[in-house]
């Protein structure tokens, strides 16, 4: 995690320096002086989704727990929370109406807007990131092309013994020589298309499957329902002290503060996941080299 933080801060500072440059040629010259690892770290920095999955899961969990506390206070524990008889009698009905309104507003918002993102600031930032990524891709292609041309004419070719190497052996060798672009390019160029495709699949991001997400949300919902029943005193065989109401209030305030912090962070621009940042950038570089080799091969066949 410490290394990821260091790499992320370095990449963030480089991106900040690039933003200060007004001339595109100055940006091109600056990027061309960077090595491929730094360029791929920048590319990964600009390529991350505006709302990473970890952020969405965290928000979903926080929202479930804040719903739990609201339901416990205003619906189930209303008579114990509010000493005023009028408030304790009216709060369950008000909470029920509030819940129905929230459901209706959410449904109408989804119907009207769908998945469209019309935010002008978000559009400008995404277009800027697309432009930076295209520039980085062009520079990387140029660098790989130069490395390919500099590889000796009598370059190493795959022998029969190497052809029999399984995927694990090839992968281990690739990870060993991954820091040297020229050596990596020369070695991968001796592999066939099937092996390169397997390597690219390995270095690609594992998709977060729908069943996995559903299982997490299902387990989270069960925990929230159980906690709501427990804190509200609905489980007869477990005696809950009165102090748990104050504990529930503390949980509510803590979650509310966390949600406000997340909203403020999201308004500042694109969110980034620091965890495994260095590894994800390195895997992106591997995929870039493989894409370059495959593209060159296919271009020769098409021409």
Curated annotation (Swiss-Prot):
The chain crosses the membrane at residues 55-77, 92-111, 208-230, 240-257. It is a multi-pass membrane protein. It is found in: Cell membrane. The keyword Nucleotide-binding does not apply. GO terms for cellular component: plasma membrane. Its main location: membrane. Keywords: Cell membrane, Membrane, Transmembrane, Transmembrane helix. It comes from the Bacteria. This is Uncharacterized protein YbfF.
């Amino acid at each position: 995690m410490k290394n990821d933080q260091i790499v992320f801060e370095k990449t963030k500072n480089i991106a900040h320096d690039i933003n200060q440059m007004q001339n595109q040629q100055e940006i091109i010259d600056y990027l061309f002086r960077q090595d491929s690892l730094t360029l791929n770290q920048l590319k990964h920095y600009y390529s991350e989704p505006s709302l990473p999955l970890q952020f969405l899961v965290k928000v979903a969990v926080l929202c479930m727990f804040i719903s739990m506390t609201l339901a416990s206070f205003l619906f189930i524990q209303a008579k114990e929370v509010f000493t005023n008889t009028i408030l304790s009698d009216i709060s369950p009905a008000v909470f029920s109406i509030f819940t129905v309104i929230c459901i209706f507003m959410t449904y109408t918002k989804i119907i009207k807007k769908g998945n469209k993102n019309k935010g002008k600031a978000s559009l400008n930032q995404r277009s800027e990131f697309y432009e930076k990524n295209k520039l980085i891709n062009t520079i990387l292609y140029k660098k790989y092309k130069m490395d390919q041309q500099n590889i000796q004419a009598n370059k190493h070719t795959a022998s029969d013994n190497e052809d029999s190497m399984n995927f694990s052996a090839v992968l281990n060798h690739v990870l060993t020589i991954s820091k040297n672009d020229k050596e990596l390019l020369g070695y991968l160029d001796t592999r066939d298309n099937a092996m390169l495709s397997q390597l690219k699949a390995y270095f690609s991001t594992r998709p977060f499957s729908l069943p996995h997400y559903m299982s997490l949300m299902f387990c989270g919902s069960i925990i929230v329902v159980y906690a709501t029943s427990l804190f509200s005193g609905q489980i007869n065989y477990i005696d809950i002290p009165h102090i748990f109401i104050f504990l529930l209030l503390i949980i509510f305030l803590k979650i509310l503060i966390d949600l406000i912090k997340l909203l403020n962070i999201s308004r500042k621009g694109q969110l980034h996941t620091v965890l495994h940042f260095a590894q994800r950038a390195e895997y992106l570089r591997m995929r870039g080299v493989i894409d370059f080799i495959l593209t060159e091969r296919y271009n020769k066949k098409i021409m």
